[in-house]
Amino acid sequence: MSNDPTHQFLVNKIVSIDIGGIDFSFTNASLFMVATVGAAAGFLYLTTSQRGLIPTRMQSVSEMSYEFIASMLREGAGSQGMKFFPMVFSLFMFILTANLLGMVPYFFTVTSQIIVTFALAVFVIGTVILYGFYKHGFGFLKLFVPHGVPGALLPLVVAIEIISFLSRPISLSVRLFANMLAGHITLKVFAGFVASLSAFGALGIGGAILPLIMTVALTGLEFLVAFLQAYVFAVLTCMYLNDAVHPGSH
């Protein structure tokens, strides 16, 4: 099982909890989701609780993260979209922290679970729909009627727009899930090559050099992917929120 590259994604029960025939067990995925929230919140608290006129390096990282998301949201959804800053910032920090924790050996990568990423995506799209109808009423439906479309093509275009909108949770969740899953499997495969070849003595160790180099290179790449996937999720969230704030802008 240790050589199985997919073994690292298995969800295992830590505490079995059954209520009315429904499984509410506390699993390793639950544990690392709690750890992710705790790590992100702890980092932000420790780096901002005693802010100085001259920021420390960690305080600078927190302030840069704040400005990074604030700028992204202003560009993506305008000044009116800033009311969603806590939501977008929390999503970005959760995904980034979860991705980085997943890079630690023997830690569980919660963003490699489609149920987790899909829940985050549904939360985003649900917020867009609820706020869109709350703010604009049925005017929110203008989102599905692009400007300048000939009347004869309007039914087809509206149908395409609705299907495209409803597919957003799928594309948003699968993008994050698939990238994290594929990256960790690839790392495991190359690390397995290193371990297997090293067992054959000096000759095997010589042959393990190339897989070792690839493993180190892929590890660096995965750290970059960890940030990029959190960034992409946040950018797309800002774009979708713009549809709720300005439904008739396209």
From Swiss-Prot:
Regions that span the bilayer: 26-46, 84-104, 114-134, 143-163, 193-213, 216-236
Organism domain of life: Bacteria
Membrane topology: Multi-pass membrane protein
Compartment list: Cell inner membrane
Keyword terms of this UniProt record: ATP synthesis, Cell inner membrane, Cell membrane, CF(0), Hydrogen ion transport, Ion transport, Membrane, Transmembrane, Transmembrane helix, Transport
A Pfam family per the record: ATP-synt_A
InterPro entries: ATP_synth_F0_asu, ATP_synth_F0_asu_AS, ATP_synth_F0_asu_bact/mt, F0_ATP_A_sf
One GO cellular component, as annotated: proton-transporting ATP synthase complex
GO molecular function annotations of the record: proton-transporting ATP synthase activity, rotational mechanism
Family classification: Belongs to the ATPase A chain family.
Assembly, per entry: F-type ATPases have 2 components, CF(1) - the catalytic core - and CF(0) - the membrane proton channel. CF(1) has five subunits: alpha(3), beta(3), gamma(1), delta(1), epsilon(1). CF(0) has three main subunits: a(1), b(2) and c(9-12). The alpha and beta chains form an alternating ring which encloses part of the gamma chain. CF(1) is attached to CF(0) by a central stalk formed by the gamma and epsilon chains, while a peripheral stalk is formed by the delta and b chains.
Function: Key component of the proton channel; it plays a direct role in the translocation of protons across the membrane.
This protein's name: ATP synthase subunit a
Classification of source organism: Bacteria, Pseudomonadati, Pseudomonadota, Alphaproteobacteria, Hyphomicrobiales
